């Protein structure tokens, strides 16, 4: 990741060399689409933060969604700022701000991935061990986990910045080691745990819903949809960060991979609010004038639904949604 950041001049050189070519045109088109996606995503995540932070009663799961929306908003803001700075003259001040925005983007990315891993793992535990989870789960576990993840990601990215920044004491050997630790953490721990827990959750809830003739809860759909979108759209950015340094790709190919990974990651961070409101508005023909807050609250509801769409008066979390 940091090796890629510090070698970003290769991409800039390729862009300067290929001005007027098909590659440069593709870069401009993809960057414009990414900027538009970032602006839409910032609006959507800001709406989620406003509703969850000031307009709704929050259950423990909503704490995760609130923090995930904040991480996505920070990622999209830094991505949009980076895209804007690329059009400015490369003076010394702009270079420093450009690197700051990239560091901020990597920080927000790791926070978002960590939160998604925590969300999918917690939901998996809640369906595999419902009684134990309900009785032994600390009251403020969600807030503690979110605070811990933000702190750990801040420390990790602060450490990498101290070793890998072009404007601080750059140490290539230490930067390489820190880069490998980050790669192992993201690609070898967080992503596999998130994928495995989500797959387990899907299989368990699918079997339970068929056995008890209940529809999966909307919360279950939200979790799986968010993880799936991340794996499809945002994971390529990690692959770009960690694979590009090892491969001697032509400059034109680097530009295309660079642009496509940014566009796909911006789509991933912008998609979650859309998922919440689409899932929350299912079967909304009975209440066609529901507010956005009500729709969001329905999407994050933990109670299971019966086949006809009713919510049981006394529900458990045993079937997993």
UniProtKB/Swiss-Prot annotation:
Tell me yes or no: is tRNA processing among this UniProt entry's keywords. no
Ranges for region Disordered: 302-321
Q: What is this entry's stated membrane topology?
A: Multi-pass membrane protein
Provide the membrane-side ranges marked Cytoplasmic in the record: 55-59, 134-142, 206-218, 281-321
Instruction: Show the GO MF annotations.
Output: G protein-coupled peptide receptor activity; G protein-coupled receptor activity
Residues annotated as glycosylated are 2, 6, 16, 92
The record's annotation in Gene3D superfamilies points to: Rhodopsin 7-helix transmembrane proteins (1.20.1070.10)
Record's keyword terms, sorted = Cell membrane, G-protein coupled receptor, Glycoprotein, Membrane, Receptor, Transducer, Transmembrane, Transmembrane helix
* Membrane-side (Extracellular) residue stretches: 1-33, 81-112, 164-184, 240-257
Membrane-crossing ranges are 34-54, 60-80, 113-133, 143-163, 185-205, 219-239, 258-280
| Pfam families (alphabetical) | 7tm_1
Q: Is this entry keyworded Nucleus? A: no
Q: What subcellular compartments does it reside in?
A: Cell membrane
The record's annotation in SUPFAM superfamilies points to: Family A G protein-coupled receptor-like
Could you tell me the Gene Ontology terms of the biological process aspect for this record? adenylate cyclase-activating G protein-coupled receptor signaling pathway; angiotensin-mediated vasodilation involved in regulation of systemic arterial blood pressure; G protein-coupled receptor signaling pathway
GO annotation, cellular component aspect: extracellular space; plasma membrane
* Family, as annotated: Belongs to the G-protein coupled receptor 1 family. Mas subfamily.
Q: What does this protein do?
A: May regulate nociceptor function and/or development, including the sensation or modulation of pain. Functions as a specific membrane receptor for beta-alanine. Beta-alanine at micromolar doses specifically evoked Ca(2+) influx in cells expressing the receptor. Beta-alanine decreases forskolin-stimulated cAMP production in cells expressing the receptor, suggesting that the receptor couples with G-protein G(q) and G(i).
The name of this protein is Mas-related G-protein coupled receptor member D
Organism, as annotated: Homo sapiens (Human)
Q: Taxonomic classification, please?
A: Eukaryota, Metazoa, Chordata, Craniata, Vertebrata
Q: Which gene encodes it?
A: MRGPRD
